[in-house]
Amino acid sequence: MAASLAALPGNEVLFASEYGRRDFSLPGVKRVLLKKPKDRKKAVASISTPALDAGERDWTMAYLRGRATASSLMGVLAEGFEPDMVILSGSMGNGLFVRNLFPEAFLVGYADWYFRDEAETRYPLSTMPDIPLAPRNIRNTLQAKNFFDCNCHFTTTEWQREQYPEGMRGFISVLRKCVDTEFFAPAPASRFSFGDCELTERQEIVTLSVRDAARLREGGFWCELPSLLSARSDCHVVLISTGKEVRLDSLRESMAAFPSGMRGRIHLLDFLPPGAYRDLLCVSSLHLCKDISFMLPSELLEAMSCGCVVLAPDTGAVREVLSDGQNGFLYPSGRRMNWVMLITLLLERRSELLSIRRNARKTVFGKHNKNTLLPRHIAFLMDRYS
């Protein structure tokens, strides 16, 4: 969206984020690296003391993040840039002072998730993050402030929208996530090569994106990995970091306990360039989506767009895209799974799942195609702005 807006005559677009990537740029878009709190390490240490409960720690970090973001944006103002429109998320505190900085701007708020009292029934308790009551209420308060600061609001699935109170829900529009289906597309005679890892689509390959290495290491999938590789003697498992802040070092250390003959079939890859990531999806025999919380992950749509066989948790957001046995497969969210049995069953049916691959690609191409949806999203913003 940023690149498309920048391509329109007369527009100047800034993309502000706490994370910077030297290997990635957007045509016509100026990148702004948001400051993190200067005293972040000291702050984290001080607010991690037993004297502060979880709620106080969350409040403090939200304030520090909002203050650091405001400091960065004041630099933008000092350079003479006064935005007509700002698109922002308020759930972690970055948007706390945006309305104060840009009182005349049209603010568009991204509504990601609102914790409800009956969340246990709307989202299986065992799959919820370990967030006690006070931090949940704090995150809801940040969402509420963002809601009243902004002029219009959007989210990416009906399921997310339904979590908000009725009085807020009616003001939130659903703008579905879109994928570059020309870039994320099946490639015949696919080959993946990155560093020392070289794989082809002829091999049996299970791929998985890692959001939290510690959580994965302690979970059933990692513990069952030796059993899976023992049952599938030609299978390779590739784990990809979802960001430069997600380190796989702890997994590398833990892997030392695995039988030496198996370690060569476990590939731990740090954050990949877009092209390499796409090539990996194209050779994947099965892409496993794990540790998905509230939202519909882009990786699910990207994998389906590449024609992957996808195994994903049965959540409300995922069900809006994936139908079990039609264009992918669902597993019960929050339950302890027999990963060896489940993955083996799908790998054994690999040659029978061509229709699943075609349907996955067809679903994303028809409902989440960037060329179709992005002009609609921009038209929505321009209409609300006018």
Give the residues covered by each predicted segment.
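Acceptor-binding helix/loop patch of EC 2.4 sugar-transfer enzymes
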Residues: 40-57, 105-141, 182, 186-187, ...
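Conserved acidic donor-binding segment of nucleotide-sugar-dependent glycosyltransferases
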Residues: 324-325, 329-336, 345-350
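Conserved donor-binding/catalytic core segment of Leloir-type glycosyltransferases
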Residues: 195-217, 222-227, 238
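Aromatic "clamp/platform" in nucleotide-sugar-dependent glycosyltransferases that forms part
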Residues: 292
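Nucleotide-activated donor-binding/catalytic signature segment of Leloir-type glycosyltransferases, i.e.
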Residues: 241, 248-275
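A short, well-ordered alpha-helix in the C-terminal region of glycosyltransferases
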Residues: 345, 352-367, 373
